[in-house]
Amino acid sequence: MQLSEITKYLEQLAPLAYAEDFDNVGLLTSHTNDITGILVCHDALEEVIDEAIAKKCNLVVCFHPILFSGLKKITGKNYVERAVIKAIKNDIAIYSVHTALDNHQNGVNKIFCDALGLINTKVLIPKQNF
């Protein structure tokens, strides 16, 4: 399967327009086209990238973006830099859904509300135009 097909599906599931302005969602790293395997995780930490390498997965779909605010340097001195370097060196794409999924009407918050048996729920601060 092609990366573009998977990102198209993910963007239908959690449209990037739903994300908060401060967030960094979507395709964060990519130098690949044919996807050999997908690893899904909460945070794309260095250990997750190691697992993706071991399992021959070249796409990591994570909830939180590993690149949240701009990197000023990439020296490998912290876990973010090491994870990004390792992903790029091993041709692993990283895709984050974070607030795009948070803000979806059937997303993370609805799942939690349903699991807790809550009724009459509503979005406290709805995103404009949705």
What are these regions, as identified by a protein language model?
Residues 1-130:
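Hydrophobic structural segments
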